[in-house]
Amino acid sequence: MSESAKPRITSGSKFRNEHGFSAIKDGVKRSSSNTEGKSLERKPKWLRARMPGGERYDAVRRNVTEHRLSTVCQESHCPNIGECWTNGTATIMVMGSVCTRACKFCAVDTGNPKGWLDPEEPENTAKSVELMGLRYIVLTSVDRDDLPDGGAAHYAACVSAIKQRTPEVAVEALTPDFDAVMSDVEKVVDSGLDVFAQNVETVKRLTSRVRDPRAGYEKTLSVLAHAKKHRPDVLTKTSLMLGLGETEEEILETMDDLRAIGVDILTLGQYLRPTPNHLPVERYVTPEEFNRYRDIGLEKGFMEVPSGPMVRSSYRADRVFDKNNLGLSVPEVPVPDKAMQIPVKAVD
């Protein structure tokens, strides 16, 4: 087929080719050819999320829209968006909604933002946290390999702005790996956050199949280890998806690797395939297995191990922080009346 005859594919579209997955090409995410002809798997009965709705959910949604925020809840098609937003908690995705990497499990758009950042984002994010009356906020972001520091300074500015406006709010930062440039990692760790998170995503053997080639199992471990070494008082956290073909032995080995570098909190959840062009689910892990892995994780010394089919890395992170085995807690912050009165006009 000639170039002119090929169908036009918009930025971020997923498609297959004979070469399999090849990260980024003109803003297009390519997915593995082994998904050809496969439809989404039928989910077991325990994988059911309630439909989003309610006054608090609508307030959070309006706030996200009016303040031009990207949330991982929306971009990753998270099944828990209804529960989390109804409870007034949200995970805000900073630095835009286009990622420079193309992991094979992820629904977030892939492309080249060409160095663009919203200079108003730190202040808008801080104002939104205040308006929503949150006591715990998770900040995450796309990878920004197009920026010299991977976006570390901008990320740190977002955390600092929240702390300056609402110092009582606990902040968790679920960050990129910043290509393991530790001076950039330190910018975020020193920004005033309470929890530093970087997801290992899968077991070592499956990393090259599941994650973008620029990511890495050892790279993630090195970032988490450095964050803990640089600021021993900060809680460190990571997440592992199950159902991608890993064995129980590999799960336990991953737990041991994480505990060896002092990771405090581990979340375990079922991988759910976003589209037919993403990696297929190899199997659905039962709730009973998730409960057993939680018990094993606690025995290995993790402070907390949220584990279940619907658990995601930032799922009800406020409760995890409250209940961790150190006895640390987030101060109660009353929800202001204005949390339900989201302004129609966007913040300038």
UniProtKB/Swiss-Prot annotation:
This is Lipoyl synthase. One of its GO terms (molecular function) is 4 iron, 4 sulfur cluster binding. Its cofactor is [4Fe-4S] cluster. Keywords: 4Fe-4S, Cytoplasm, Iron, Iron-sulfur, Metal-binding, S-adenosyl-L-methionine, Transferase. It is an enzyme of class 2 (transferase). Belongs to the radical SAM superfamily. Lipoyl synthase family. Pathway: Protein modification; protein lipoylation via endogenous pathway; protein N(6)-(lipoyl)lysine from octanoyl-[acyl-carrier-protein]: step 2/2. GO terms for cellular component: cytoplasm. Its EC number is 2.8.1.8. Disulfide bonds: none annotated. It comes from Marinobacter nauticus (strain ATCC 700491 / DSM 11845 / VT8) (Marinobacter aquaeolei).
